[in-house]
Regions:
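PRPP-associated nucleotide enzymes
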Residues: 1-202
Length: 202
């Protein structure tokens, strides 16, 4: 599916942590530049897996206004969640990007995550990339919830997703035979290994 972009001027952007493991494989296979688009979901205090919005690398914040009333969070709790996530994004930017500038986003962007549940992490990333000048965004994800994917698909030029699921209960991890969360050290190591491999291939 993504073979059309092999050795093109497209840039693979991974949303860490989990998206990088997927993106490394795709970038190697297609012989493309790999970089990061750091986005993190905003979670309620009692559940670090469920998100009610996300914060992107440029400070873009998006909230799931339909979900928020059902969570019964106070305005203070919502703002605390946003602030905590903004700090997480800043930390990841410093650790994983350092002083390295973003790549030229005028190139076609293949945006990759490990899956799509509510879609707010990807929607926030797409919005940030648009603000930064991206004109062509291609979404590539291994698995997604159908309704959420339909909402996100309207915001990109193309979608590649081999495993689309329906139902009221959806978890990205369920689509994988082996699943575990990557920590920031592992993400940094994966990116460093890819960079070394790419430099040797030049």
């Amino acid at each position: 599916m993504l073979g059309l972009h092999r050795e093109s001027d497209a840039i693979v952007l991974a949303i860490p942590a989990g998206g990088l493991a997927v993106a490394v494989v795709i970038a190697k296979e297609l012989n493309l530049t790999l970089d990061l688009a750091i986005v993190s979901k905003i979670t309620p205090p009692w559940n670090t897996e469920a998100g009610y919005g996300a914060v992107a690398f440029d400070g873009t914040v998006m909230l799931n206004e339909e979900l928020l009333p059902r969570l019964h969070l106070t305005s203070k709790e919502i703002q605390q969640g946003i602030s905590k996530t903004e700090e997480k994004v800043r930390r990841r930017m410093k650790k994983l990007r350092g002083d390295r500038p973003m790549p030229d986003l005028q190139h076609p962007i293949i945006l990759i995550d490990d899956g799509l549940a509510s879609g707010f992490t990807l929607r926030t990333g797409i919005e940030a990339l648009r603000k930064a000048g991206s004109r062509q965004i291609i979404l590539a994800i291994p698995t997604a919830h159908k309704e959420s994917l339909q909402a996100v698909a309207e915001k990109v030029h193309a979608v590649y997703c081999p495993n689309i699921r329906r139902g009221s209960v959806f978890a990205v991890a369920d689509a994988y035979e082996h699943w575990r969360d990557l920590d920031e050290e592992e993400v940094a190591g994966l990116l460093e290994d890819f960079t070394k491999m790419a430099s040797k291939a030049v």
